[in-house]
């Protein structure tokens, strides 16, 4: 681990060192739990830049370290009024490998920093879950598909342009096994039956079902 500069600098050498440091930290996070927990917590609390802080937070989430919840709460408490910074936090929450990630995402729909009227928040939470957490989105029970159907139903009237982009993971059904294709097709049929279905959604849904 290199010794950080006392002052954050955007120099090629410093950027390279941060990149290497954070790659090493992520590998270490999957090693001995106590040591990983200490190292990740230390980097998060001593970080003098967002890159290092987010790298520590990401490692804690990916490896499901004991410090994860406390660090996520600290980040939330500090940055909840900064939407763009919180987008990073929502993405980490939505792409977590935790078994209860869908439950977490549903709960975050009520978070103080989240709103269905902001496309960036929608993409960072709902979009990240559907598009960047395949294990959870494609759960065998179809719960991920049903969640997206609920969100798209809301957005169909609220913001059809955003809905049209969010549906992408659901219309790629032909890439998956027969069981998942069946559930994805059922989800698309459910959306197709909506009253006042937007033109953009209708076009994508009918093409996927053809």
Regions found by a protein language model. Name each.
Residues 3-210:
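Long, ordered, helix-rich scaffold segments
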């Amino acid at each position: 681990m290199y010794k950080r500069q006392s002052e954050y600098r955007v120099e090629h050498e410093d950027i390279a060192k941060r990149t290497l440091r954070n790659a090493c930290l992520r590998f270490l996070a999957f090693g001995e739990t106590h040591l990983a927990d200490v190292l990740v917590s230390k980097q998060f609390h001593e970080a003098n830049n967002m890159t290092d802080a987010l790298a520590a937070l990401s490692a804690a989430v990916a490896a499901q370290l004991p410090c994860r919840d406390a660090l996520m709460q600290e980040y939330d408490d500090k940055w909840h009024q900064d939407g763009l910074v919180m987008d990073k936090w929502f993405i980490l929450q939505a792409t977590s490998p935790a078994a209860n990630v869908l439950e977490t995402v549903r709960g975050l729909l009520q978070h103080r920093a989240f709103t269905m009227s902001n496309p960036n928040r929608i993409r960072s939470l709902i979009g990240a879950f559907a598009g960047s957490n395949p294990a959870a989105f494609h759960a065998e029970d179809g719960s991920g598909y049903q969640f997206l159907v609920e969100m798209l139903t809301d957005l169909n009237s609220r913001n059809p342009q955003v809905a049209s982009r969010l549906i992408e993971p659901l219309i790629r059904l032909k890439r998956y096994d027969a069981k998942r294709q069946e559930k994805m097709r059922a989800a698309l049929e459910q959306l197709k039956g909506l009253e006042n279905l937007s033109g953009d959604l209708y076009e994508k849904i009918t093409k996927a079902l053809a």
